[in-house]
């Protein structure tokens, strides 16, 4: 199907691209503030007609009352961009007493037309673009492809662009910050403020690529940077590898005394990380009340040293418009940003909230506040601030505007729109690794891993150190983690090795953290724990307490899988303390849920239920549906053990609704597996099989070897009830070998219990007793109360079948007393049935007849249809005395 052509407006040597909000003179973009561009569009669309001043002002500021001077300023900026003045106007004519008129004839054209106004060089560029477009077979709606020094003006396939002509990589600059020579802490905020403003100034015009402030902060934590005005050759070489930066700006500032009128002296040193030398020293002095002027002077001098053209007056106006409107807002924003980058999200959030109050219309304060809320686990509040940032982004540069919009779309989440925005950024700036990684992340989150991998393959073609950045490998790992754990593990290891080589310790920690999770999912717990601990130690050294808390959780999870509940509980409590100190409510909720799980496994059902009930509203407070869904898995298990089967089913269905909404197949697998248990206990075997098989299919789909084995064990238990004990025996034996190899003691004991039951159903009492003997050591170390009860009942039945009925009865009576004490009501019915079975074996059938009748009736009243049926069948097999 043919795509609709894009429309442009042309007049004189100019062309307007309305979709991209861009004015071009020939091929060169002409910088305009957003309001000046809107003014131009209104006048152009009313070409040769007078537009009254009031109409213009209402269109430009529909919700605000502004002075006419604001309109005059926009007209001034517009005329300056068009190369005219009020006295010598060719385009924007003043009609005294009325308004303004666009005096030139405007031509509306489509991108398929060959404009008569395009110069010869432009015609050649268009021809190339059209040839490439015809090979690619489709257009990208709404995106303009911008190569360094050459604006193409048409859309075509990004992969073809890179295949035909690799992007020109701009020189990169990292502003490392400035020492505060005043010695006064209250002036420290100027370091961040000056760094951010200078980065914005140098980025204007897009001739240089600026390293992000976040990456600079990370590098300063990772590398042993001295507190000096210049860096050694060795440190410069490390920065080149660590940051991918060709140039760095470093230096110091001092605030002169009040007698000097509150002036600031800024001393800068421009150093080349490749040649490993200082190439320029710059000193400027200006008013602290007008830091922009100080930065403009410094930026102009640095541009001159680098041979980069100066910022135009129009660009200067645009940059000034993108800054906070007052000193207090700038101070609070800078301090909040610095806190965020030091992993102090709670303090950063408070400062950024004050910054927003001081200047509610400053978009970047809202964007930073969104990041702070995300770090604290408040996704809904993060979304609200991201939306405000986007709504207020009109005064920002085009690049900044797209970055703000991309974040808004991603956290909404509207991943398809985020893909569109990040693709636009990456197309405009193909040498910017950050934008490529953002695009791949959005594609991955949108469920398009193949697209993400294609984007990442393109990034790998960038020259080193960009193309060898370990973050590319981490994104590859994320894109394939659901389908190929082995390859994901290899990518994570490669990322870690690259991080070690470049000195990027925090990237090593990220790689190890991801590797730990993968090893946990593979059931390789003994390998996972030291990897988690390595990540934790790196985070601790960097002061990243959230990273520490997360790794404590990961290690605790592995300990749970190993059956070491005491150590797991200790680790979860330590993690909870870290999250509380951070003010991370989502982390606190998760830790409460984990603690509830440990208390539950330890047999304290009442306390566990209280912790679950406390965690659920916290999850809902931060709107963490994924965390809530995982909690509901454990809550459903607890409800089943308390013989609250209908409640357990309802809980599972609630969790499934949450997990399906986010397409979380991992949690869906757990919930389906848990749902099968109450259904089986109710005697609904066909329904139970259906959900167990769905669980297994999901776990196989996402390559979860460990949890898939758990699903097979549940199906084996069900097979016994269906009369297929031989099949159950084989499955249980296979699972035991797998669990033993993965050091999964709890799962091994579960499989052993099911194997014993299968052997007893087959009449293989001796084999069942042998299994009990072999698993004695594992059983003695078990700390998982529900699994321990399940195994103990099966082991006692095996003892009874082998003739040791007195010992078996004694064990079962002890088990029953424990179950009554702890509240494991569902197991009480199983234990009573096993005791009745011993009495029948011992020839005391008449004595147990009444107990079986009572057991069947009570089980049925609690919904335990399977036990009720077994008790009734056992009672019917007892001969009636005549």
Predicted regions: what they are:
Residues 2-10, 31, 43-48, 65-125:
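DNA-binding patch around the recognition helix
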Residues 151-166, 195-209, 213-350, 359, ...:
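Catalytic-center loop of serine/cysteine hydrolases
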Residues 357, 390-391, 427, 460-461, ...:
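Amphipathic alpha-helical segments of tetratricopeptide repeats
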């Amino acid at each position: 199907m043919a795509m609709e052509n894009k429309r442009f407006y042309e007049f004189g040597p100019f062309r307007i691209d309305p979709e991209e909000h861009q004015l071009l003179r020939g091929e060169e973009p002409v910088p305009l503030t957003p309001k000046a561009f809107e003014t131009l569009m209104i006048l152009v669309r009313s070409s040769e007609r007078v537009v009254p001043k009031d109409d213009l002002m209402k269109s430009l500021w529909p919700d605000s009352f502004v002075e006419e001077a604001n309109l005059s300023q926009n007209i001034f900026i517009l005329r300056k961009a068009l190369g005219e003045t009020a006295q010598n106007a060719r385009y924007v004519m003043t009609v005294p007493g009325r308004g303004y008129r666009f005096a030139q004839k405007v031509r509306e054209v489509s991108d398929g037309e060959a404009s008569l106004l395009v110069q010869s060089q432009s015609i050649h560029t268009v021809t190339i673009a059209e040839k490439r477009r015809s090979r690619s077979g489709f257009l990208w709606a709404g995106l303009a492809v911008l190569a360094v020094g050459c604006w193409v003006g048409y859309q075509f396939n990004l992969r073809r662009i890179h295949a035909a002509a690799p992007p020109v990589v701009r020189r990169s600059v990292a502003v490392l910050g400035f020492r505060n020579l005043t010695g006064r802490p209250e002036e420290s905020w100027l370091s961040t403020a000056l760094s951010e403003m200078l980065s914005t100034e140098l980025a204007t015009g897009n001739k240089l690529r600026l390293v992000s402030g976040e990456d600079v902060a990370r590098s300063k934590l990772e590398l042993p940077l001295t507190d000096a005005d210049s860096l050694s050759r060795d440190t410069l070489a490390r920065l080149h590898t660590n940051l991918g930066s060709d140039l760095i700006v470093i230096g110091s500032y001092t605030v002169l005394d009040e007698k000097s009128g509150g002036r600031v002296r800024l001393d800068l040193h421009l150093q080349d990380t490749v040649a490993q030398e200082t190439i320029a020293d710059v000193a400027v002095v200006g008013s602290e009340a007008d830091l922009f002027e100080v930065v403009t002077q410094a930026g102009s001098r640095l541009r001159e040293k680098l041979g980069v053209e100066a910022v135009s007056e129009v660009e200067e106006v645009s940059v000034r418009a993108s800054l906070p409107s007052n000193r207090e807002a700038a101070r609070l924003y800078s301090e909040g940003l610095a806190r965020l980058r030091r992993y102090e999200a709670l303090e950063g959030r408070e400062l950024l909230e004050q910054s927003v109050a001081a200047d509610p219309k400053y978009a970047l304060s809202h964007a930073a506040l969104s990041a702070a809320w995300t770090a604290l686990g408040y996704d809904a509040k993060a979304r609200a601030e991201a939306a405000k940032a986007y709504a207020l982004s009109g005064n920002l540069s085009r690049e900044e505007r797209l970055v703000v919009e991309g974040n808004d779309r991603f956290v909404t989440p509207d991943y398809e729109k985020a893909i569109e925005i990040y693709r636009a950024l990456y197309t405009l700036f193909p040498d910017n690794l950050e934008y490529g990684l953002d695009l791949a992340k959005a594609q991955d989150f949108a469920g398009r891993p193949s697209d993400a991998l294609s984007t990442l393959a393109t990034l790998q073609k960038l020259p080193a150190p960009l193309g060898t950045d370990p973050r590319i490998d981490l994104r590859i790992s994320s894109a394939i983690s659901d389908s190929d754990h082995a390859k994901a593990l290899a990518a994570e290891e490669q990322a870690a090795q690259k991080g070690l080589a470049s000195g990027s310790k925090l990237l090593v920690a990220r790689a190890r953290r991801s590797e730990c999770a993968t090893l946990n999912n593979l059931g390789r717990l003994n390998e996972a724990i030291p990897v988690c601990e390595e990540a934790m130690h790196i985070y601790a050294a960097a002061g990243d307490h959230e990273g520490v808390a997360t790794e404590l959780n990961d290690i605790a999870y592995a300990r749970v899988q190993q059956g070491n509940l005491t150590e797991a509980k200790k680790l979860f409590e330590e993690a909870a303390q870290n999250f509380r100190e951070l003010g991370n409510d989502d982390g606190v909720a998760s830790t409460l849920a984990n603690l509830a799980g440990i208390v539950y496994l330890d047999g304290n059902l009442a306390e566990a239920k209280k912790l679950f009930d406390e965690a659920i509203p916290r999850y809902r407070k931060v709107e963490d549906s994924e965390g809530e869904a995982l909690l509901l898995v454990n809550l459903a298990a607890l409800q089943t053990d308390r013989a609250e089967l209908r409640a357990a089913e309802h809980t599972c269905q609630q969790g499934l609704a949450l997990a399906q909404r986010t397409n979380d197949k991992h949690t869906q697998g757990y919930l389906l597996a848990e749902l099968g248990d109450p259904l089986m206990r109710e005697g609904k075997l066909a329904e139970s099989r259906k959900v167990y098989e769905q669980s297994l299919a999901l776990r196989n789909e996402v390559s979860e070897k460990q949890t898939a084995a758990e699903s097979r064990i549940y199906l084996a238990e069900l097979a016994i009830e269906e009369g297929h004990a031989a099949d159950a025996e084989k499955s249980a034996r296979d699972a035991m070998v797998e669990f033993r190899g993965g050091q999964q003691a709890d799962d091994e004991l579960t499989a052993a219990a099911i194997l014993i039951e299968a052997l007893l159903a087959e009449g293989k009492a001796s084999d069942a007793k042998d299994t009990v003997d072999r698993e004695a050591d594992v059983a003695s170390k078990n700390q998982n109360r529900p699994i321990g009860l399940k195994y103990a009942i099966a082991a006692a039945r095996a003892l009874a079948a082998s003739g040791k009925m007195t010992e078996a009865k004694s064990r079962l009576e002890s088990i029953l007393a424990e179950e009554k004490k702890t509240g494991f009501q569902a197991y009480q019915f199983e234990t009573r049935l096993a005791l009745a079975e011993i009495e029948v074996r011992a020839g005391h059938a008449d004595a147990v007849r009444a107990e079986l009748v009572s057991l069947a009736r009570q089980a049925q009243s609690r919904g335990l249809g399977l036990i009720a049926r077994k008790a009734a069948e056992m009672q019917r097999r007892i001969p009636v005395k005549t």
